[in-house]
Amino acid sequence: MEKKIGFIGCGNMGKAILGGLIASGQVLPGQIWVYTPSPDKVAALHDQFGINAAESAQEVAQIADIIFAAVKPGIMIKVLSEITSSLNKDSLVVSIAAGVTLDQLARALGHDRKIIRAMPNTPALVNAGMTSVTPNALVTPEDTADVLNIFRCFGEAEVIAEPMIHPVVGVSGSSPAYVFMFIEAMADAAVLGGMPRAQAYKFAAQAVMGSAKMVLETGEHPGALKDMVCSPGGTTIEAVRVLEEKGFRAAVIEAMTKCMEKSEKLSKS
């Protein structure tokens, strides 16, 4: 990719994008400009990755073809309003702020701007993220492909229509927390059975990771994969019976429904 890439803000998620992009070799460090309000942080990123340290958000906006706005949602609109006059005509702005809609972004930047709303999740920090990419009507297929390729440097990415953002929050953005709870609960049970805790976490986490990989790589329905493990009269079907009796599926569905409702409510506030 020959385009210049800019970052305004570079917290954990911004750094995950930056690191994944450089590691992929898609762009050279010299093609990247980063600005954060902390000079020490920018200097550290320069030392670690060899990127260009910008002196202002406006400098990033003037130079970069693709600008990742990676600041907190509460200040996103203010930051974008301050750079809009510095953007080039064909600049593409990618927001990774949860809850900030395309319309809100366009009101800050101008309705003639190319904007993408993206939502990566925290496994991006270990190169296993899942990112939704939602372009506005002005974004070209080439622009979208460039952004998808960037997010695929540290996981998977898919184009999602904006009304589907709330299900994305439930099934991807927030779901690592549910999975961590499941891993913790399984490990607690293993500890109860006598296994050392560190070993219990490793067994539980590897089982979850391996199971997810089977879903993705085999293309089999999760229910069919579950049935493969459940021998007649065996230990696994006994565990499944208890989970069903305790409302495991219903609890997950209800929790995600509430998560989606909260996401929709927050986007309107």
Swiss-Prot record:
Keywords: Amino-acid biosynthesis, Cytoplasm, NADP, Oxidoreductase, Proline biosynthesis. It is found in: Cytoplasm. It comes from the Bacteria. Inhibited by p-chloromercuribenzoate. GO terms for biological process: L-proline biosynthetic process. InterPro entries: 6-PGluconate_DH-like_C_sf, NAD(P)-bd_dom_sf, P5C_Rdtase_cat_N, P5CR-like_CS, P5CR_dimer, Pyrroline-COOH_reductase. One of its GO terms (molecular function) is pyrroline-5-carboxylate reductase activity. Pathway: Amino-acid biosynthesis; L-proline biosynthesis; L-proline from L-glutamate 5-semialdehyde: step 1/1. It catalyses: L-proline + NADP(+) = (S)-1-pyrroline-5-carboxylate + NADPH + 2 H(+); L-proline + NAD(+) = (S)-1-pyrroline-5-carboxylate + NADH + 2 H(+). One of its GO terms (cellular component) is cytosol. Transmembrane segments: none annotated. Its EC number is 1.5.1.2. SUPFAM superfamilies: 6-phosphogluconate dehydrogenase C-terminal domain-like, NAD(P)-binding Rossmann-fold domains. Coiled coil: none annotated. It is an enzyme of class 1 (oxidoreductase). The keyword Iron does not apply. Catalyzes the reduction of 1-pyrroline-5-carboxylate (PCA) to L-proline. Does not catalyze the reverse reaction. Can use either NADPH or NADH, but the activity observed with NADPH is severalfold greater. Belongs to the pyrroline-5-carboxylate reductase family. This is Pyrroline-5-carboxylate reductase. The gene is proC.
